[in-house]
Amino acid sequence: MVLRNAWTVIIYVILCSRSLADCVVDHVHLSGSWGSAKFTVEVADTDAERARGLMNRASLAKFASMLFVYDGPQQVGFWMKNTSIPLDILYFTAEGILLDIRDNTIPGDLTVLRSSGPVQYVLEINAGLAETLNLGEDTILNHARLVQGKKTLACR
């Protein structure tokens, strides 16, 4: 009986360690009924970083991304000014649930692409990846950033 309990504890620790290892600052994971994907990520969490975003960059590696983090849920808008990379823009709630996708944005376009409701995270990825991965409304954002003292759903 003691041996069985010891193995249970060991397996639990391994599973928890693996789960926590997936929630790191330099990577973001998306998951849903479609499967999952891992991206390297740059975090933009100050006004200056969010304003600059991916402007004036010539390229973005296939599974690279930028995560915009806001202090609290709010309606946000993005444009493609000085951005030469076509992007998919993914808007996530404070709980890390996908709310909107603005796909295949046009480089240099000044049209403001607003979220349909309050969001706390926005993830920019290369254009076409949202469709290729078949991202849907059940997509969850996994990242180490805290939300009101709690981790996003998949990082708990």
Regions picked out by a protein language model, each given a short descriptive name:
Residues 1-3:
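N-terminal secretory signal peptides that target proteins for export/translocation
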Residues 5-18:
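Bacterial N-terminal signal peptides
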Residues 22-156:
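Compact, glycine-rich, soluble single-domain proteins
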